[in-house]
């Protein structure tokens, strides 16, 4: 079967071995050796050979000694979660509108801040891991610690940054980015379908609004699976979220769902349980296990942030909507304990890198730890926390955006003081059909209307 997607068939297969081990499947040594012996050039497009090995992998089961409980269905997830607030009292309309404006603005600021160094944060440069490379880049320009947008200034150190429209010399709006695109998509879905939307509505909206070349990793695989299994001329009941999330999708516990949490948190402001449910519908067809839980957790945190202004309480609100014995919950609970003894964000990140540095730079768990650490050590100060989230490395624009979104919901735009807000001119220019250019003020108004509709449904 011819199947690619985000990367070559061989690359997908190699990532699949890593993913299977992570989710508790013991890959036989003979299969692992066969894959290791394949040449990255001569075998990368060998569909038949890769298919044959994939068939062997499909028969493997999770080990009985795997210590985690990581259910897939929403019903099972709810049974496995701890107690939590589920829902808070309503907020004054005038305050809520300001908080929506703050959340959209915070998301854009954090995204733009991290965008030029996303590649550096994930892959590192010049022999340095991401966080160290970012620090060296900033120090070489006398910009450490991070306090404003990255400069594209060439000082002869051979570091490379990207996205000139998000650099301090040029920034005038929020440029296209998937972290913003999916928040816009969530808004469009809730506007059109209300609270009863399904995962199929989401897939259809992607097809209608998102160019394939702006979709990455797990999302690339899932939408390809969906379209390959769905006749163009009619709807198909055959394709399932189990198929779209699993078939040739080794990225199913990466960060792609986690960055899609925000819109559901906005639409369900004050209702973490419903926000997590909406996030589940969004994640279940592209991700599995901790990939799903990451989106559910942050949707719940964002929904709670409209009412709660304590970082530990917010983290626990998020944890109350995911299984208590999953890898993400375990990591976050360990992080809360480390926050009691690590004196600052940088020593905290030393621990994160030591214990979770073997994960891919765009995995759900390690990046979630960056965000919650930035919230805690930044003491919910918008400017400082967002800068920490980007300094932490790995997926810098995603983490900056999530952190900024939470803080915007906590404070509202009128209470957010940052030199990084004015340069965006309240404007987003995305690559989403139907949102070619729009102000964050308008997005806040539309989000408020969606919130009222869902609340009253």
Protein language model features and the residues they cover:
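Structured, active/binding-site neighborhoods that engage oxygen-rich ligands
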Residues: 1-457
């Amino acid at each position: 079967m011819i199947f690619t997607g985000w990367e070559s068939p061989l690359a997908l297969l190699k990532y699949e071995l890593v993913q299977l081990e992570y989710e508790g499947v013991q890959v036989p040594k003979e299969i692992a050796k066969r894959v290791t012996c394949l040449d990255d050039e001569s075998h990368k497009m060998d569909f038949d050979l890769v298919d044959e090995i994939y068939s062997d992998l499909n028969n493997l089961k999770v080990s009985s000694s795997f210590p985690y409980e990581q259910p897939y269905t929403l019903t099972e997830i709810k049974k496995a979660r701890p107690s939590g607030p589920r829902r808070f009292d309503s907020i004054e309309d005038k305050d809520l509108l300001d908080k929506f404006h703050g959340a959209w603005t915070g998301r854009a600021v954090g995204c733009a801040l991290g965008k030029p160094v996303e590649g550096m944060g994930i892959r590192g440069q010049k022999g340095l891991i991401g966080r160290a490379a970012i620090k060296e880049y900033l120090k070489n320009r006398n910009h450490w610690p991070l306090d404003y947008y990255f400069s594209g200034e060439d000082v002869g150190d051979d570091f490379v940054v990207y996205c000139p429209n998000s650099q301090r010399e040029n920034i005038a709006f929020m440029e296209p980015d998937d972290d913003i695109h999916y928040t816009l998509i969530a808004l469009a879905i809730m506007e059109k379908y209300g609270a009863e939307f399904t995962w199929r509505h989401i897939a259809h909206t992607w097809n209608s609004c998102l160019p394939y070349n702006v979709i990455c990793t797990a999302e690339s695989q899932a939408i390809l699976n969906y379209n390959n299994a769905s006749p163009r001329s009619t709807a198909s009941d055959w394709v399932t979220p189990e198929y779209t999330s699993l078939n040739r999708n080794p990225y199913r516990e990466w960060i792609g769902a986690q960055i899609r949490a925000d819109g559901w948190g906005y639409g369900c402001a004050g209702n973490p349980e419903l926000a997590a449910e909406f996030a589940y519908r969004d994640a279940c067809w592209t991700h599995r296990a901790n990939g799903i839980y990451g989106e559910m957790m942050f949707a719940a945190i964002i929904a709670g942030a409209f009412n709660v202004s304590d970082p530990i309480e917010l983290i626990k609100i998020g944890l109350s909507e995911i299984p208590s014995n999953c890898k993400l919950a375990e990591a976050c609970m360990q992080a809360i304990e480390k926050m009691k003894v690590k004196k600052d964000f940088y020593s905290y990140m030393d621990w994160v890198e030591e214990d979770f540095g073997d994960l891919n730079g765009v995995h759900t768990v390690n990046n979630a730890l960056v965000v919650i650490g930035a919230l805690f050590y930044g003491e919910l100060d918008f400017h400082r926390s967002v800068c920490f989230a980007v300094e932490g490395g790995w997926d810098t624009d995603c983490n900056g955006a999530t952190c900024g979104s939470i803080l915007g919901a906590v404070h509202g735009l009128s209470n957010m003081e940052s030199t990084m807000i004015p340069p965006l001119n309240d404007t987003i220019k995305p690559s989403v059909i139907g949102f070619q250019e729009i102000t964050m003020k308008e997005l806040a108004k539309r989000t408020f209307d969606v919130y009222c509709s869902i609340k009253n449904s």
